[in-house]
Amino acid sequence: AADPRLVREGLATLGQHYPALKGLAVAHAWGGLIDSTPDGIPVISAVDTMPGLYLSTGYTGHGFGIGPGAGRLAADLVAGDPPIVDPHPFRYSRMIDGTDLGEPGMM
C-alpha cells in the first residue's frame, strides 16, 4: 500500500513546483515492489545451470508496454524457435559472468 505520508509530501512538492496543481486531490495511490535488474534491462533467458528453467523478469514496472514482445521472445526461447529479436542483451548469465552492468540505480 502507498505510504500516506509520502503521498502528502509528494503532493506538497508538486504544488511547490507547479502552483496550478496546489491543492490537488489524489483519488488513488499505489505502493509496492517493482522488480528490477542492476542495468535496468529485463532478463528473458534460460538459466544454463538449471535445464528447463526460463526467466522473464526485471521489467522495472514497464512490463505492460513491452509485455507482448517480451512474451514472444520468451515463447521462442522455450519452444526452441528462432527468436524474434537477438536474445543476447537479455541473457541471465550477464548477472553472474562479470559483465559490466553499470552503476546500480533505479529506473
Tell what function each PLM region has:
Residues 1-52:
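Active-site lid/adjacent beta-loop-alpha segment flanking the redox-cofactor pocket in flavoenzymes
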Residues 48-107:
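C-terminal lid/capping helical subdomain adjacent to the catalytic/cofactor pocket in oxidative enzymes
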